[in-house]
Amino acid sequence: MGSYDHVPAVEAHADADALRATERERLRTLVSADLTRARQLHADDFQLINPLGGVLSREEYLGGIDAGHINYRFWEPEEIVVRQYGEVAVLRYRSSLEIVVQGRHVPRQPYWHTDLYEKHGGQWQVVWSQATGTE
């Protein structure tokens, strides 16, 4: 399978649980606008591809939340599926999300999310995130 080796099952299970918990914590920090903790969970080179295809850096994204331009009202994930390759992991899940962006209210609706995490200094951080709206 190329240069990627799967992590042993026991370790993978523990890491998968830690990744799920980290992603749920990340969502809570974004909804509550806890930017101190959010910065710790987002890598310096983080990028978000939003449902409209826009690309935001970590500072643009978290700065938008800090300024009130992005206001998550509700964000509840369903089952989070994890695929791990050493110190890199991909998470995929559906969620229900309600948000206000630049004053425009987007009512609660379903989205698919794909997130790429890397382990930095013993801590998992999200590096890439993409959200796709569904109906």
Predicted region positions:
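A beta-strand edge to alpha-helix "cap/lid" segment located at domain peripheries
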Residues: 1-40, 45-135
